[in-house]
Amino acid sequence: MANPFVKAWKYLMALFSSKIDEHADPKVQIQQAIEEAQRTHQALTQQAAQVIGNQRQLEMRLNRQLADIEKLQVNVRQALTLADQATAAGDAAKATEYNNAAEAFAAQLVTAEQSVEDLKTLHDQALSAAAQAKKAVERNAMVLQQKIAERTKLLSQLEQAKMQEQVSASLRSMSELAAPGNTPSLDEVRDKIERRYANAIGSAELAESSVQGRMLEVEQAGIQMAGHSRLEQIRASMRGEALPAGGTTATPRPATETSGGAIAEQPYGQ
């Protein structure tokens, strides 16, 4: 039976991880993914370099071993030649020594040739491993480039998504006519203006229907009548300024006092 504390711990860790992923910045997550891909490529490149280095080292050992084999072959031939010359000269002791030297060189030659065969096998395996490592690095480099290109695309899409979210929020706010915070909405401002306008109209109607309103109307009517009378007087005086038909200038007459006490203007010549 599983430990309940372990299960609870795993559940909390999974929940915590999901919450982090849910609230994490996508831009940061994209950068983390690219950095992880770069670290993987770097590690793969180092491993491939070690494999290729091992193949190069085996190649150098093989070349040295082949050079040693060539030298041993030359030594064996030289020892056999000297042994033949000593035998021809009748020097059996020298011939024996040269033959023994030739046998020793031949034994070394056999050992070197066996070592070369082993090195060739290892070298072939190293060549195959190096080729595979190179291909793996090339493939991973292509994958890394694709991820970098994908990062650029995702960042562009992320910026577009942010702008679209802002536009959508603005449109939603305008459609609901709900201004954020303490700023009044358009409906509230419209209601306030209409309420003030209606109150002003109501006050004007009350003023017109009151006694003071009637008195004000009488005063306004008197002012208008006086203004009309004054206008007619000015017109009459302007008509009197014109010359008579005989060409003589009319003698002006003093203004006479009207019944109301005001002095009325008299046109010239009347």
From Swiss-Prot:
Its main location: cytoplasm. Residues 238-270 are annotated as: Disordered. Levels are regulated by proteolytic cleavage by PepD to help maintain cell envelope homeostasis. Belongs to the PspA/Vipp/IM30 family. Disruption phenotype: Loss of the gene does not alter resistance to cell envelope stressors. This is PspA protein. Involved in resistance to stress. Facilitates intracellular growth of M.tuberculosis. Associates with and regulates lipid droplets (LDs) homeostasis under conditions of stress and may regulate non-replicating persistence (NRP). Could be involved in preservation of envelope integrity and tolerance to surface stress. Has an inhibitory effect on ClgR activity. May block ClgR activity after stress and then, form a multiprotein complex with Rv2743c-Rv2742c, leading to the release of ClgR. The keyword Nucleotide-binding does not apply. It is found in: Cytoplasm. The gene is pspA. Self-associates and forms homooligomeric complexes of high molecular weight in vitro. Datta et al. show that PspA interacts with ClgR and Rv2743c, but Armstrong et al. fail to observe interaction with either ClgR or Rv2743c in E.coli in vivo when assayed using a bacterial adenylate two-hybrid assay. Also interacts with the serine protease PepD. GO terms for cellular component: cytoplasm; peptidoglycan-based cell wall; plasma membrane. Induction: Expression is regulated by ClgR. Induced by carbonyl cyanide m-chlorophenyl hydrazone (CCCP). Induced by the cell envelope stressor SDS. It comes from Mycobacterium tuberculosis (strain ATCC 25618 / H37Rv). Keywords: Cytoplasm, Stress response, Virulence. Overexpression of PspA results in altered lipid droplet morphology. Residues 240-258 have a biased composition (Low complexity).
